[in-house]
Amino acid sequence: LARSNKDSSLGYKGLSLFLVEKPSFSGHDFKHPQTDGGLLTGKAIATIGYRGMHSYDLFFEDFLVPAENLVGEEAGEGKGFYFTMAGFAGGRIQTAARATGLMQAAFERALSYAKDRKVFGSIIADYQLTQIKLARLLATLTAARQFSYAVAELMDDGAGQMEASLVKLFSCRAAEMLCREALQIHGGMGYAEESAVSRLFVDARVLSIFEGAEEVLAIKVVARELIEESS
């Protein structure tokens, strides 16, 4: 996303999207020099979780991008902001789906551990407190999954823009809670890096931040549409 019009008074209407090509690479940083002297460099931003997918700091130094790389061709000039915004709803429903998958993995591991770990002569799955926790976790997981399916159907019909934000708000916060309780069922082993649930716990934290922080979604999307529809 770059400014393609020198007139700064245009604001976001002066932004366009371009495809930038580079070769594939291994590792967490790269340099891509151009024959005419331009240089693109990138370095992965270290994070506490979600290590299978990285965000990068990118630096463009006299890097040339051909005009034919403009997304939308000539009609796409000045439409970069609109193209970006158009993808947000899809990103939010798929983030809710990610949260559901993460919850499923955490629940399965908590259930398996509860059936295997013995405390005071009994597996912890036999204790009522553990049973209550497992039931609540499954209820939360099921609610998030069915909510996601319902919103996905709305979006298939061309609707559900606000609902995409709602399901992200619910599912991502639910994933944080569920993974916390799944880790708690594991006890001290849940805090060990060798335990998969520790990774799920850390990964869940970022879900309510990317694809629209929950505070922004609540104020700028959900509340705004609710107020407009009620007036």
What is each model feature region?
Residues 8-12, 48-52, 75-76, 199:
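Solvent-exposed alpha-helices and their adjacent loops that cap or buttress functional pockets
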Residues 29, 69-75:
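Cytochrome P450 core scaffold surrounding the K-helix E-X-X-R motif
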Residues 44-48, 74, 111, 119:
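Glycine-anchored helix-breaking recognition loops at helix->coil/strand junctions
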Residues 2-5, 20-23, 61-63, 68, ...:
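Fold-independent oxyanion-binding glycine-rich loops
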